[in-house]
Amino acid sequence: MEGLSLLQLPRDKFRKSSFFVWVIILFQKAFSMPLGVVTNSTLEVTEIDQLVCKDHLASTDQLKSVGLNLEGSGVSTDIPSATKRWGFRSGVPPQVVSYEAGEWAENCYNLEIKKPDGSECLPPPPDGVRGFPRCRYVHKAQGTGPCPGDYAFHKDGAFFLYDRLASTVIYRGVNFAEGVIAFLILAKPKETFLQSPPIREAANYTENTSSYYATSYLEYEIENFGAQHSTTLFKINNNTFVLLDRPHTPQFLFQLNDTIQLHQQLSNTTGKLIWTLDANINADIGEWAFWENKKNLSEQLRGEELSFETLSLNETEDDDATSSRTTKGRISDRATRKYSDLVPKDSPGMVSLHVPEGETTLPSQNSTEGRRVDVNTQETITETTATIIGTNGNNMQISTIGTGLSSSQILSSSPTMAPSPETQTSTTYTPKLPVMTTEEPTTPPRNSPGSTTEAPTLTTPENITTAVKTVWAQESTSNGLITSTVTGILGSLGLRKRSRRQVNTRATGKCNPNLHYWTAQEQHNAAGIAWIPYFGPGAEGIYTEGLMHNQNALVCGLRQLANETTQALQLFLRATTELRTYTILNRKAIDFLLRRWGGTCRILGPDCCIEPHDWTKNITDKINQIIHDFIDNPLPNQDNDDNWWTGWRQWIPAGIGITGIIIAIIALLCVCKLLC
């Protein structure tokens, strides 16, 4: 008893020691420091690459649903190309699937389409459906179309991604992105006494939809939406549009808008002014590398090298001609040349308008920069065309040649003008801008390569619109209703891939790994250890580096798996379709034979000569390729390129826990020694 009594502490001292130990334990429990990718449970950084095709599913808690955008596979994102991937169907109810995390989208869409009778084509969004929360550009399209169906589906079987909800149909007036849903198998969580519970995100909810990134809006007007031949117009203002007939980038539309605004090539009447693009103009400029990094523009849309030429004027039979007038023009790209021969030598401060019936010289007027030259004569000039042939900010030269317009319809802006009594053979109007010199313009475009990702000043939802005629001559048809990426996958394999995408060749050459998830989990994880002096900032950097590195490899691996699986499914679909056709023919043949009508082939003719193809070997080869890529040759392990820092830092989580336990034991012994 005496030996046992030596090991016992007084009651008051025991209480103090126990309280001190419990404080340490609770402190460790409350301030857990996750280092690595944290999802449903804390994962070590090195475990991420081994989750694909390496782990088995023990419970549904190990599944994490992720929305992957189709633009990551290289599909065309402009409105004309995107609308060709959507179609209407009836008799198929919509389906909605929730997902936990997604990628930031560079291009989102917002549709409001009406039928010819004025009724709505698209259904309103159900309760709980919110717009996609991370959009760099939102393409807002309005217009009319036949809408031959109840709902707008994706022809390739992809989903329309909303905020944490993916639907098979398009809802009216809600931002959405195209994508597919993938499921990740997470490692089974390890329950320990000192581990804090994982932070749960609110289901289908995003608190901050802006995420400190500017969202720019482009507006369009579409005619005959959903039909084989449609017209899409990019809207500059309510009466000025640009007809788009080729793939383009949002940056091109922004620069085109600024150029038209700067040159004052806007409709000065209540009628429409529709500009078309010359074939020599490159509309695929200024490609972005997703959100974080803006690539230098490989080519600038130089306004001083563009020519604006009015082509024709169409009027309806209505009494109010001004409200029904449609003026068409062409924006062309001209080679750099000298225009000294077009500048009047005796009047260097004038803009020359050459008119076949006469010429009158007017004195120059003082005006502000950026205003138009307005011709207000009442007589009709046969064959007149206004063409801006040069400008560098303050200098502009305009000449007119014949197309059958009245002088009041020319896009110029001089409120008053009087003809000179000296001659009746020529007319020269005074502009509010001096004549362009023969020197090369030095004013850079407004969107310089070094500009930031903020939206341009003219890109608000009110003054940016997008309207376009988009009928592609070489448009590819869909390959079937397959619930996967399909066309995007074909593009990622090289058939339709856009070469200007930045690709991390270290991870893979078949997809774009420059992606980032917009989960609320990351902010909590990164901030969980920032309070520690000296150690906090470094640990946050470790977390971010590990997250970005492993996420890229994981997403690329998923895309490769989807690519090869989809091709096999396409072949299987084709084989099934042909087998069904062959079965129907046999049924018809039996029917005809029973009626003794002379045999199947005699009655069916060429339709009898259908032979179903055997695609078994092709499907088997694709499956073997998947096994070879993801089982025999798994994704690269991060240990292959570990250096001294990435090697010893893996001991940090364990070291922190061991150090805390040692400190607690030492403190307990010290307290016991002092109290004893």
Swiss-Prot record:
Residues under site feature: Cleavage: 501-502, 637-638
Keyword field contains Lipoprotein: yes
Keywords (A to Z) from UniProt: Clathrin-mediated endocytosis of virus by host, Cleavage on pair of basic residues, Coiled coil, Disulfide bond, Fusion of virus membrane with host endosomal membrane, Fusion of virus membrane with host membrane, Glycoprotein, Host cell membrane, Host membrane, Host-virus interaction, Inhibition of host innate immune response by virus, Inhibition of host tetherin by virus, Lipoprotein, Membrane, Palmitate, Secreted, Signal, Transmembrane, Transmembrane helix, Viral attachment to host cell, Viral attachment to host entry receptor, Viral envelope protein, Viral immunoevasion, Viral penetration into host cytoplasm, Virion, Virus endocytosis by host, Virus entry into host cell
Post-translational modification comment from the UniProt entry: The signal peptide region modulates GP's high mannose glycosylation, thereby determining the efficiency of the interactions with DC-SIGN(R).
Chain positions covered by the region annotation Disordered: 312-351, 406-458
Domain of life according to the entry: Viruses
Disulfide bonds: 53-609, 108-135, 121-147, 511-556, 601-608
Cytoplasmic side: 672-676
Annotated Basic and acidic residues bias: 330-344
Residues forming coiled coils: 554-595, 615-634
Region Receptor-binding, annotated ranges: 54-201
One GO term of the biological process aspect: fusion of virus membrane with host endosome membrane
Family matches, as InterPro entries: Ebola-like_HR1-HR2, GPC_FiloV, GPC_filovir-type_extra_dom
Sites where a glycan is attached: 40, 204, 208, 238, 257, 268, 296, 314, 366, 463, 563, 618
Pfam families given in the database record: Ebola-like_HR1-HR2 (PF22307), Filo_glycop (PF01611)
Signal peptide feature range: 1-32
Lipid modification (S-palmitoyl cysteine), residues: 670, 672
Family of the protein in this entry: Belongs to the filoviruses glycoprotein family.
Domain-related comment: The mucin-like region seems to be involved in the cytotoxic function. This region is also involved in binding to human CLEC10A. The coiled coil regions play a role in oligomerization and fusion activity.
Misc remark: Filoviruses entry requires functional lipid rafts at the host cell surface. Essential for infectivity, as it is the sole viral protein expressed at the virion surface.
Protein's name in the database: Envelope glycoprotein
Species this protein is from: Sudan ebolavirus (strain Maleo-79) (SEBOV)
